[in-house]
Amino acid sequence: MVVMGNGPLKGTVATSGAKNAALPILFSTLLAEGNHVFTNMPKLKDIESTSELLNSLGCETKWVGDEFHVTVNKPSSFEASYDLVRKMRASFLCMGPMLAKYGEAVVSQPGGCAIGSRPIDLHLDGFRALGATITQKEGYVHAGSPKLKGGTFLFETVTVGGTENVMMAATLADGVTVLENAAKEPEIVDLAEYLNKMGAKITGHGTSVIRIEGVAKLTPAKHSIMPDRIEAGTLLIAGAITKGQVTVTKCVPAHLEALILKMREAGFKIETTKDTMTVFPCDQWEAVDITTAPHPLFPTDLQAQFMALMTVAHGTSVITETVFENRFMHVTELSRLGADITPKTRVAVVRGCPGKLTGAPVMATDLRASASLVLAGLVASGETVVSRIYHLDRGYEKLEDKLSSLGAKIRRIE
């Protein structure tokens, strides 16, 4: 991706459907045979990878105009192979549905972005609490249970994937399951809403205690994927960093309160409605500190983009990453553009240098890091070339087209 610094962005831009809601919802289709229909499904590499995995399990996936259809048949095999799972961590989310519906699942241990260990132990402990037998051998996890039984399970640490996987498994268990210290992310709420449309009985989603009353059967439904709050936040920061005026539509500002609060604290004027947010031109902004944490606090998935904004702020900002231990890989690349950042294990000190970034060749290391490099490139003088943008395609739908529509000089070269 070649990015030229080109002054303020101006205009209106819409967000796509949320990747992090779409993936668990697609895997949840395994709970109900028949035809599931989705709207607002983003066209992303991770959606392609999920389709490939579902197809390998006997499903049929296809686009019908703007709708995405998943036809679920009884799988000929209950194994999700290494070749498919290594592309994307979220693939492990097929385990809960298969285990609940068919009593067995064999899933390769996961891959995805290299931003920390993100262990699957909490998922497996949750399955065990529902009565499943788990064995691990030769890089695969084998789970089996004639019939899952409801129970109470406390997550030792907050885990989004673990909450989703165990919640899906519990929908078909005998009796009531209570998940304590559950994750509260909006994407979990979207998943629970789809499961309830299929006939599940879930309450408490969006709080730290989720209650699932098991049912005998689920049936396919139709659902619109929620807007992507991380993409919305990235686009808002793009407007801010270029001193532009950008309105982001088809979003839910209530999902981004932590980001909006910090941007206002830095000096930006931001106006919101129920489903839009506008950032106004700001000549200079102050450095502010952030600490990432599970929702509703500052999202780790916006940490890299916010760091880009802080590289050109007035003053010094301290960025603390509490969610993943290896999430400062963008620091060395931002430094190549002239940013002044001192990283330690989980803390980065960013000394703002407004107007001092200059274009250079940089390399994306993960999905959100790639976005931060594009944002920095928008305000660096000269040309910034971001390589390995396949990371970007995993989670952003046509980001260069959206930024171009706002006046950015950005193009993709093969």
UniProtKB/Swiss-Prot annotation:
- Matching Pfam families: EPSP_synthase (PF00275)
UniProt xrefs under NCBIfam families = murA, PRK09369.1
Q: Where does UDP-N-acetyl-alpha-D-glucosamine bind?
A: R89, R118, P119, I120, D121, L122, D301, V323
Which residues does UniProt call coiled coil? none
**Which family does the record assign?**
Belongs to the EPSP synthase family. MurA subfamily.
Q: Which residues form the active site?
A: C113 (proton donor)
Q: Where does phosphoenolpyruvate bind?
A: K19, N20
Q: Keywords, A to Z?
A: Cell cycle, Cell division, Cell shape, Cell wall biogenesis/degradation, Cytoplasm, Peptidoglycan synthesis, Pyruvate, Transferase
Compartments, record wording: Cytoplasm
Pathway assignment: Cell wall biogenesis; peptidoglycan biosynthesis
- Chemical reaction(s) catalysed: phosphoenolpyruvate + UDP-N-acetyl-alpha-D-glucosamine = UDP-N-acetyl-3-O-(1-carboxyvinyl)-alpha-D-glucosamine + phosphate
Give the protein's recorded name.
UDP-N-acetylglucosamine 1-carboxyvinyltransferase
A GO molecular function assigned to this protein is:
UDP-N-acetylglucosamine 1-carboxyvinyltransferase activity
An example GO CC term for this entry is: cytoplasm
| Enzyme class, first EC level, given as a word | transferase
EC numbers listed for it are 2.5.1.7
Question: Which InterPro entries does the record cross-reference, listed alphabetically?
Answer: Enolpyruvate_Tfrase_dom, Enolpyruvate_Tfrase_sf, MurA_subfamily, RNA3'P_cycl/enolpyr_Trfase_a/b, UDP_GlcNAc_COvinyl_MurA
**Residues with PTM 2-(S-cysteinyl)pyruvic acid O-phosphothioketal:** C113
Q: What does this protein do?
A: Cell wall formation. Adds enolpyruvyl to UDP-N-acetylglucosamine.
* Keyword set includes Ligase: no
In the record, biological process GO terms are:
cell division; cell wall organization; peptidoglycan biosynthetic process; regulation of cell shape; UDP-N-acetylgalactosamine biosynthetic process
